[in-house]
Amino acid sequence: MIGKPKFKKGDWVKFEWKGEIIEGEVWVVDAYGTFFQTKEPSYDIFSPKKNMLYKHMEESCVTKIDYKP
């Protein structure tokens, strides 16, 4: 729901990116979406395995994981 994000900074989550499951830590919460997407919160997620920051990942594509990879 816009303005009420499911995840918070520091949560560990996973999502699919180009057919691959990526696990990472939420670094930024955009509670009201972004410039091009205002229907749901989005997140900037850092994956240490890939050494990559994935920006503006929509909440509907993200799932919380209960462990730190």
Where would I find each of the regions flagged by the language model?
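Short beta-strand-centered aromatic/proline hotspots
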Residues: 21-32
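Short, solvent-exposed secondary-structure boundary/capping segments
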Residues: 32-42
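Mixed-charge, Lys/Arg-rich low-complexity intrinsically disordered regions
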Residues: 1-12
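Intrinsically disordered, low-complexity, charged/polar segments
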Residues: 42-69
